């Protein structure tokens, strides 16, 4: 019978072999609108460089909008989030993700340095994503703000999410998939979980979401308490009180 020590040594030896077989990833570092951006070197090869450069232009434009739309205090917090550009992963759809959990990252081949950062493994479809979700970078940054600044268990947000689910007011709403594509009616992505409720409504607050409520005005009519909470946590000035009519 093999001893536990022998098994441990065997496991460590296997890990060393696996590590040697998988070359370490290397990245180039750039700064866009005050954010640190780490670009996987494989995206900068001649075959990929043009697509990557176009994605970087679009990313810079989205970050510039974030700076324009969001108050300086929250922007300073958002700029602490490192952005990572990666090639697509085998057996995964190209996507952008905020990495909050080490366990998920280890299981899906991400490097530890990406923890609490945002990874864009969707460079090839970046332009299409900006058409579908005009503020999709803000969506991911909202996840980071929720985790790093507000805390995942923010009590006010949790209560409003539970109330929205119970009300069923998001069960069948309009969805826009981009220019020249028909509007559909679906359950709102915001109801997936509280994190998506915050990110989706933050898109509506600052610009246009791809699900109803699309805009700040629609959010104020559909979910006024959530609008009020968002204005508070994003440090927006209080809206002016209505002026009394003059005689």
Pin down the residues of each PLM region.
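Bacterial N-terminal signal peptides that target proteins for export
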Residues: 1-8
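Structural recognition of the beta-strand scaffold that forms the well-ordered cores
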Residues: 38, 82, 144, 197-201
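Acidic/histidine-rich, surface-exposed loop or edge segments in extracytoplasmic proteins
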Residues: 31-53
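Metalloprotease/metallohydrolase-associated module, dominated by Zn2+-dependent proteases
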Residues: 112-114, 161-246
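Acidic/His-rich structured neighborhood in mature extracellular/periplasmic domains
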Residues: 56-162, 166
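Bacterial N-terminal signal peptides
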Residues: 8-17
């Amino acid at each position: 019978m093999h001893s536990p020590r022998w098994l441990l040594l065997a496991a460590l030896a296997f890990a060393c072999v696996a590590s040697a077989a998988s070359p370490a990833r290397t990245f180039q570092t750039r700064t866009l609108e005050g954010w640190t951006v780490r670009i996987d070197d494989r995206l900068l090869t001649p075959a990929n460089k043009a697509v990557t450069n176009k994605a970087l232009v679009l990313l810079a434009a989205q970050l510039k909008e974030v700076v324009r739309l969001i108050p300086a205090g929250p922007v300073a917090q958002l700029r602490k989030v490192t952005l990572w550009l990666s090639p697509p992963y085998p057996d995964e759809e190209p996507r952008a993700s905020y990495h909050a959990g080490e366990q998920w990252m280890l299981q899906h081949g991400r490097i530890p340095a990406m923890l609490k950062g945002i990874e864009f493994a969707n460079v090839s479809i970046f332009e299409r994503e900006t058409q579908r979700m005009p503020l999709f970078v803000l969506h991911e940054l909202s996840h980071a703000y929720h985790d790093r600044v507000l805390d995942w268990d923010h009590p006010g947000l949790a209560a409003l999410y539970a109330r929205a689910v119970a009300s069923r007011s998001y069960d069948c709403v309009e969805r826009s998939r981009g220019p020249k594509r028909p509007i559909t009616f679906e359950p709102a992505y915001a109801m997936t979980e509280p994190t998506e409720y915050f990110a989706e409504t933050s898109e509506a607050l600052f610009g246009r979401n791809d699900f109803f409520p699309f805009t700040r005005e629609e959010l104020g009519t559909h979910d006024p308490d959530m609008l009020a909470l968002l204005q508070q946590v994003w440090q927006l000035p209080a809206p002016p009180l209505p002026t009394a009519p003059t005689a």
